[in-house]
Amino acid sequence: AYDTNRGLKQYGGLHTQADFDRIKAQIAAGNEKVVSAYNILKNAEYAQPTIQTYPVETIIRGGTTGQNYINAARGATMAYQNALRWKIEGNTSCAAAGIRILKAWANTCKLVSGDSNWALAAGLCGYEFAQAAELLRDYDGWGNNGFENFKKWMLTVWYPGCIHFLRGRNGTWENIGNQGGIRPGHYWSNWPLCNALAVISIGILCDDVFIYNQGMSFLKYDQVGTFRDPRTDDLILNDGCTEFWGNLIVTTSESELETGAYGKLGQMQESGRDGGHAAMALGLAVDIAH
């Protein structure tokens, strides 16, 4: 939502205060399923305020040696899970731990690198760090300019790579080598979905409606050409790259494009690849929609 007086209306990232109020009420009422689920989080290794993170100056994903991106993935998860505990149970030790972890990474990390797989680290870890910080924005333990410095880190280390990938797809935008260019869009949907989600999350965190709308534009309007439907001899519009809503979920909704013998398959672009990638694409799409 956009307020012309001050940019984004701040409802939060993946969670709103109403979400946390509902969870706390369910726990207080003794809802066994909610209490059981929350205890899993509360007892998780990464949700403990004593957990340690190990930031690196250069995050590397892909290549033959030196991969260390898992440190960033773990660090973001630690901050996020501790932030959840603070929002739900009011444990200030968890809030302080989340901020300690986020500041450690912001004070150390300067680059996301590797082979072409760097884009996965940028998108997945970028949105996780942004969402963790969003949960902790109202905690008063950031210190002098701590929150502002963290936002600058997201804008200088994470945002440029994510938007660069969405614009250029590591140089494969037209995909000339595949069928003479008639099937543009080399990357399957997990790649652009996580980077679009990172851009959107950074826009929310930084109260920047322009960056937020950049991420949304790739989902709403991105179009890169045509491809040939193997079932016919006709060229049909490729409604953008693989994160574009019309291309991503057309077979799960009512659409004039799904009226033939194949029917409505209820599948996404990653469906049929393997369970992990298909579930991940759905999860990323749901997070974006949320």
Residue ranges and their predicted role:
Residues 1-185, 193, 197, 217-220, ...:
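Extracellular glycan-targeting catalytic surfaces
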Residues 204-290:
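Long, repeat-rich segments with strong aromatic
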Residues 136-139, 202, 206:
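Residue-level signature of the C-terminal ends
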Residues 121, 183-194, 203-207, 211, ...:
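Short, contiguous, pocket-lining structural segments
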